[in-house]
A protein has these predicted regions:
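Cross-family detector of peptidyl-prolyl cis-trans isomerase
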Residues: 1-119
């Protein structure tokens, strides 16, 4: 949950117009879309967006983003502080081993969800 990505075709640099925010796992998209981020704060907002139960995914009255700001565009005093577990740390290595043990033969790097703190 919280994956951010782009629709694309097989050509390089083809992800240019359709993005998505995943509310729940959806294995049919695995290896077909380009992931570029993860929602680390505000997943409740993502889950509140309207969605379509239909296979075509078309929402008849979709929510609209009327204003979007990324943290780098905010005045310095308004930017959130985001802390992520260092991938060179002992706790990260322990997380990898615990995840590997839990997933067994199904383990992949995508199974590791780094702990994040946003203030």
């Amino acid at each position: 949950p919280g994956v951010a990505g782009m629709a694309r075709d097989e050509a390089p640099d083809s992800a240019n117009s359709q993005f998505f925010l995943m509310r729940h796992p959806y294995p049919a998209l695995d290896k077909r879309y380009t992931v570029w981020g993860r929602v680390v704060s505000g997943l409740d907002v993502v889950r509140a967006l309207k969605f379509s139960p239909n296979p075509d995914g078309i929402v008849t009255d979709p929510d609209r983003m009327t204003r979007v700001r990324v943290p780098g565009d905010l005045p310095e005093g308004e930017r959130p502080t985001v802390r992520v577990l260092s991938t060179s740390s002992a706790p990260f290595r322990a997380l990898v081993e615990d995840t590997r043990a839990a997933r067994g033969a199904d383990f992949s790097a995508c199974d590791i969800e780094l702990p994040v703190e946003v203030n």
